[in-house]
Amino acid sequence: MNRFFKIVLTSTRRASTNGSGKRKTPFEGDKVHIPDEPYNSKVRFFICFKKKLKHGIQIDESLLSEMPPIDAKLISHLERLSLVRFDSEQAVANLRNSIRMAKRLELVDVEDVEPMHTVWESQECPTFDDVEEEPLPIDKVFRNAAVRFDDFFVTPPGNVPLESNERFDLNVINKWDTIGKPVAPEAKTIRLAEGRRK
Amino acid sequence: MWRRRFATSAATTTVATVSRFKPVIGLEIHVQLNTRTKLFSRCPTSDASPNRRVAPFDMATPGTLPALNHQCVHRALKMSRLLKCHVPKWSRFDRKHYFYADMPAGYQITQNEYPIARDGLFGYWVFGEETDTPYWKEVEIVQLQLEQDSGKTINILDSSPSESSESRSLIDYNRAGCALIEIVTSPCFETAIEAIRFVQTLRLLIIHHNLSDGELHRGHLRVDANVSLTVDGKPGTRTEIKNMNSIRTIHTAINFEIARQFEILSNSSGKVIRETRGVDSEGRTVPMREKDAEDTDYRFMVEPNLPILKIRKEWMEGAERELETQGIADFEWLRDRCGFDPRSSIHIAEEPDLLAFVKRCVRFKDSGVTADEILYWMRELKTIMQRSKGNYPPKSDFFAKQFTTLIHHSGRLTRLRLLDLLRFYATSSESEEDVLLEDVMEFIDKNDFWRINDTEKIDKFVEESMAKNGKLAEKVRSGHAKSFNKMRNLMIETSEKRIELEDAEDAIRRFLQR
């Protein structure tokens, strides 16, 4: 607790003094909201959602909904949504951990609170006249293009079906955090390949 | 081969539909607006070679922000009024995510939860083959939303089996970010005809009010159809037919899909899979390559870069004012003001040349000429022009005037004479000699082409013709049918087509009975 206020106070004080190496704000005297030093986020949790937490700064994991088991179907669903491929059990296990961490947000009381969609909530959408402006010159359009064919961008064909999803040892992924190892074991495929080599 | 198979399956559908199956069709129509610039950037939308109409925002350059085009909102408001939609006080934009190379941001900005308009009603006439009586149908409009178009993809497929396949896609972003209005109807159509008449009527209205250029073949109007069959009143699984861009395709594809589903369902163990289907060049629906057996998750989220769009009162008034000054569309004018039937009014309004001709005719129309008469004689004129290899319809004002005058006096001329005069005026005015031509009334008066109604006069023609052609007269007297016709034609010919066919026949019969 005390540490948190100390951090906030020091950061505000630092911002208001002018000197080299000091934090600067666009307007002098503005508050700096990002602290200079990291602090334990659990402290913040405690301050904001005191009511929901039972034992002080510790988050009661039993209040959270259960982790869904990660299966081949879920992995392929996530890969399709993100267009990112998991390259190992470790990657999936990391994601699983992140999901577990994010689940803490379930404890936030959002009853009768409209979600915030934009920082321009009180504004109206501005509209613009239908007046043409010069489009980008062709060389600028292609400045970042890796491959160009005549005046077209070139991409790999779309709608490529994803490969089989039975690539990972699901047991390892789902148990990793209870095994207690900092890094998940290597992917099954690699192990198998190495085993064969041996 | 396919046609025959298709025809039989379609026929069985209609029979069986009565007993167990009923098609249910809903449409999604994407209308490309003809604004000068795109929906969220001021990049011009005019035609150009690939990737010449691209602003940084259109290719999702990081750091660029959407700037909403006011004209698009204006046109959407006009469209909402045309479709009698409810326009809420505000609407909002959403992101719909999917990965396609022609959608560079990885999402499309559209309106999902709070569209610009909803709950509309649109009435139109449905007519089928020539014999059907048209009926009025009202379609519920679920919602109307503004959204971005995607770019265009050219797929280059390499069929060689080698692993280093050369398959790739070429992308043109000229269309990316252009403004679309998507019109979503409730699943209230029961036949393909109902669906296509709706699209046809809507298209004419859209063009009239300058919302879109409405050229189907150029993709200004793209239609998706959701088709399912209810079995004994229970809703069935639907399939979605994507991206149809001609009226004929919509018609055949929907019918094909109904027939296909019917064939599956009439087999007791058959099951229709929920899927997206494309259309091949023959109008058959084929499964699309993409697999979306499980429902695609678009991860809709509110577009954070666009605040809420509040619809101001003066915007609404402006849209209404403009609709009023624009007046009714041509097909409505033909139908409601000139008395053309629903089928012809749509048909004429769809063909600019025909429309111009009919407009000219209506301008010169004497009070006695009805729409049906104009239509009847237009059909005759079409045959004449086809035979004489002239252009139909003739373009000159002069001809239109003579045409309506002739129709007005059609009761006083024989049919053959009228056709002759039409041919003469149509072919001569086509060759730009009309300056030399006199008015048809003067022409008729001068040559005395008026129909002979006096039976005594006609009888005289019979007597003369019979006397002149002794041999033929013998045959006619003996009851030879061919000779009878020959004699009749001879008579008409000598009278310079002033005797009506029936009159001539009656007169010969009278003569024979004497």
Swiss-Prot record, chain A:
Intracellular or extracellular location(s): Mitochondrion
Cellular component, GO annotation: glutamyl-tRNA(Gln) amidotransferase complex; mitochondrion
Pfam families, per the entry: GatC
EC number per UniProt: 6.3.5.-
Domain of life (superkingdom): Eukaryota
GO biological process: glutaminyl-tRNAGln biosynthesis via transamidation; mitochondrial translation; regulation of translational fidelity
Function, as annotated: Allows the formation of correctly charged Gln-tRNA(Gln) through the transamidation of misacylated Glu-tRNA(Gln) in the mitochondria. The reaction takes place in the presence of glutamine and ATP through an activated gamma-phospho-Glu-tRNA(Gln).
Protein name per the record: Glutamyl-tRNA(Gln) amidotransferase subunit C, mitochondrial
Taxonomic source organism: Caenorhabditis remanei (Caenorhabditis vulgaris)
Lineage: Eukaryota, Metazoa, Ecdysozoa, Nematoda, Chromadorea
